[in-house]
From Swiss-Prot:
Protein's gene: M
GO biological-process terms attached to the record: protein complex oligomerization; symbiont genome entry into host cell via pore formation in plasma membrane; symbiont-mediated suppression of host autophagy
TM helices/strands, residue ranges: 23-43
Residue ranges, compositional bias (Basic and acidic residues): 71-80
Lipidation (S-palmitoyl cysteine): 50
Organism (species): Influenza A virus (strain A/Hong Kong/5/1983 H3N2)
Lineage per the UniProt record: Viruses, Riboviria, Orthornavirae, Negarnaviricota, Polyploviricotina
Protein name: Matrix protein 2
Length: 97
C-alpha cells in the first residue's frame, strides 16, 4: 500500500486528509514555512544568475566616483595600487620555540 493511499482517502467523493491535527498551530506554521522555502528555492533556481551576479559585482564596487574629476579618480586608483604593492613586500616571520 502506498503512502498516498494511507494519508489521503476519498471522503464523500472529495479528497481529504485523515489527519486530525491539521488545525494545530505548529502544523500550520510548519506548512507555511515549507511553502515559503519552496517558493524561495524556485525563485533562487530561476534567477540565480541575476542574484549572484548582483552580489558578486555589487559588493566589490569601490566608493562612488560620481561627480569626481577624472584626474582625481586616476590619482585614487594609483594610491590604491601602491597600497596593494606595498603590502606584497611585507612578510612577518614567526619563529616558535
Amino acid at each position: 500500500m502506498s503512502l498516498l493511499t494511507e494519508v489521503e482517502t476519498p471522503i464523500r467523493n472529495e479528497w481529504g486528509c485523515r489527519c486530525n491535527d491539521s488545525s494545530d498551530p505548529l502544523v500550520v506554521a510548519a506548512s507555511i514555512i515549507g511553502i515559503l522555502h519552496l517558493i524561495l528555492w524556485i525563485l533562487d533556481r530561476l534567477f540565480f544568475k541575476c542574484i549572484y551576479r548582483l552580489f558578486k559585482h555589487g559588493l566589490k564596487r569601490g566608493p562612488s566616483t560620481e561627480g569626481v574629476p577624472e584626474s582625481m579618480r586616476e590619482e585614487y586608483r594609483k594610491e590604491q595600487q601602491n597600497a596593494v604593492d606595498a603590502d606584497d613586500s611585507h612578510f612577518v616571520s614567526i619563529e616558535l620555540e
